[in-house]
Amino acid sequence: MPGAAKNVEAPEWYVYQFEVRKVPFYVGIGHRERASDRLRWVCSQIKRELAGKPGKWDLHTRVIKYFILCPEPVTHRCICKGLCRADALKVEKRRIIDLRSSGHVIANIQYNRRPLPSPEEVIKFIRKHPKPAGLSCRRQA
């Protein structure tokens, strides 16, 4: 039902991560299609800028924008589903902490290092990993 309030107790929530080159750089929670909606939203902001209008950007959407324009595939992967919102938030926090403790440079605001990494630092971390065969990106970070 469009516009209906989300039931935070219903097991309809999931945890996802955005990846480039199979390198996770952002972890979030979603309800229905939020993760794939985020990619469409970034594309809409790019179109706004191309039309001379201002885009709205934050840390992870700047990273997504860079790789969309590169172009290099940005994928989202569901890492846990069928959760209530409170459990999804716990899984999200644990995943962010695990990625950070393993040395990942990520684009999350919550549970990330301070000062936050710049988009360029996140991009540089991703780009130091080998590209899957067949990808080409000439744009520099």
List each model region and its residues.
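GIY-YIG nuclease catalytic motif and its immediate N-terminal context
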Residues: 1-37, 86, 90, 118-141
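Positively charged, low-complexity intrinsically disordered regions
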Residues: 18, 35, 39, 49, ...
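Alpha-helix boundary/capping residues
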Residues: 42-45, 95, 129
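Conserved short loop/helix modules at catalytic or binding sites
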Residues: 31-89
